[in-house]
Amino acid sequence: MTDSNPQTNPNDIPSAADVPAAAEGQQEQRRGGGGRGDRGDRRGGRRGDRRNQERDSEWQERVVQIRRVSKTVKGGKKMSFRAIVVVGNERGQVGVGVGKAGDVIGAVRKGVADGKKHLVKVPLTRHNSIPTLSNGRDGAASVLIRPAAPGTGVIAGGSIRTVLELAGIKNVLAKRLGSKTPLNNARAAMVALDSLRTHKETAKERGISLEQIYS
């Protein structure tokens, strides 16, 4: 692994003669106080930082699994960590990401970034449920999800429950079929959520009226 702290280049170190000059320049800037343009740049930077913090605070992250994995290379086995992370805003957007790194923190950070790249928009009803029954499959895992009445809660387990909760679904029934692997189950749940359509979209695809859907 490479050293994260690069060595300092001797040419980059300022000489003793340059230090007083730099200090005088800083004192002149303090006396002048800077122009209005500098103040505007500072305010704009603070506003940008505040907006970025608000955007980051909208998303919730949950680690589903962390495993130590190995890769056989020419020199032997290379050990690393794999993190499965679910990212969602509890308002109809959710994603599943996988990250690998030499440490746990780096793996989780990569998993969060990967999850935000694979977001799925989920249509929610007034009772925070899903409009229709749906199923999804990934590998040997299969997941069946169906809408539920208000007050039912999230009847699911494992990584499927995490995906449904971070999507903002509060009343739903889910059934896991096949493999018990957390990653396959989470991705199967994502496939099921991605295939959901509202009643209006379903009526438009079938070429019928919305009243015929409810009848």
Swiss-Prot record:
Domain S5 DRBM per the UniProt entry, residue ranges: 59-122
Alphabetical UniProt keywords: Ribonucleoprotein, Ribosomal protein, RNA-binding, rRNA-binding
Keyword rRNA-binding: yes
Gene3D superfamilies listed in its UniProt record: 3.30.160.20, 3.30.230.10
Ranges of Basic and acidic residues composition bias in the record: 27-61
Biased composition (Polar residues): 1-12
Residue ranges of the region described as Disordered: 1-62
Function: With S4 and S12 plays an important role in translational accuracy. Located at the back of the 30S subunit body where it stabilizes the conformation of the head with respect to the body.
Annotated family: Belongs to the universal ribosomal protein uS5 family.
HAMAP family given in the database record: Ribosomal_uS5_B
Protein name per UniProt: Small ribosomal subunit protein uS5
Organism this protein belongs to: Synechococcus sp. (strain WH7803)
Source organism phylogeny: Bacteria, Bacillati, Cyanobacteriota, Cyanophyceae, Synechococcales
Gene: rpsE
